[in-house]
């Protein structure tokens, strides 16, 4: 599989189970250790669930963007228009494809979509502050750290079961050309 084979489309309700499986495989449990984006050492439990994915699919001012190869979902990301910017989230690439340039291509398509669909001037995301490797990857793609932190939702198992007491999110931003 190569990045040249990727096609993109908006997710539908029928895609929800595949998206949940993809996101879980990229971030949680032993399957996630095949890639470099695992959060398995920071969080146990779920990363998302069908209800959470359905809310993204149904959001009137957003899109769950799927990247496919020959009809198989291999990556996804959430785009949510929020006034002057678009929020980027739920980013996942199949673990065995990570490191092969797929994430870079998906992110470029997400940024293109944010500009084309909503005229967004900025993309924003929140990343667990302790994920230095992931933050560095985003920085190489033009995102900058803001130093603005928000607390991790301890006690809400919809976001996972923390394995340490100091988790928090940092806001990253990028001006879209």
Q: Model regions: which residues?
A:
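Conserved N-terminal entry element of GNAT/NAT acetyltransferase domains
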Residues: 1-17, 21, 170-177
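Conserved GNAT-fold acetyl-CoA-binding loop/helix
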Residues: 24-53
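A short helix-loop-beta-strand connector motif used in the catalytic cores of GNAT acetyltransferases and
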Residues: 48-66, 165-168
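C-terminal "cap" of GNAT-fold acetyltransferases
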Residues: 56, 121-136, 140-177
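Conserved beta-strand in the GNAT
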Residues: 66, 72-80, 87-92
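A short, internal acetyl-CoA/4′-phosphopantetheine-binding micro-motif in the GNAT/acyltransferase core
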Residues: 91-99, 127-129
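Conserved acetyl-CoA pyrophosphate-binding loop and the N-cap/start of the following alpha-helix
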Residues: 97, 101-109
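Hydrophobic pocket-lining residues that define ligand/cofactor binding sites across diverse proteins
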Residues: 114-115
């Amino acid at each position: 599989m190569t990045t040249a084979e990727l096609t993109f489309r908006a997710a539908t309700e029928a895609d929800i189970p595949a998206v949940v499986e993809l996101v879980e495989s990229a971030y949680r449990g032993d399957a996630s250790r095949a890639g470099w984006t695992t959060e398995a050492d920071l969080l146990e439990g779920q990363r998302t669930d069908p209800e959470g994915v359905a809310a993204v699919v149904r959001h009137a001012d957003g899109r769950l963007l799927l990247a496919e190869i020959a009809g198989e979902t291999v990556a996804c990301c959430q785009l949510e228009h929020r006034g002057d910017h678009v929020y980027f989230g739920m980013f996942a690439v199949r673990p065995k494809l990570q490191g092969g340039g797929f994430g870079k291509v998906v992110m470029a398509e997400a940024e293109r979509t944010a500009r084309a669909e909503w005229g967004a001037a900025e993309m924003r995301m929140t990343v667990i502050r302790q994920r230095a490797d992931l933050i560095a990857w985003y920085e190489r793609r033009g995102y900058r750290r803001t130093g603005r932190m928000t607390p991790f939702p301890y006690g809400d198992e919809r976001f996972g079961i923390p394995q340490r007491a100091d988790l928090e999110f940092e806001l990253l931003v990028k001006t879209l050309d």
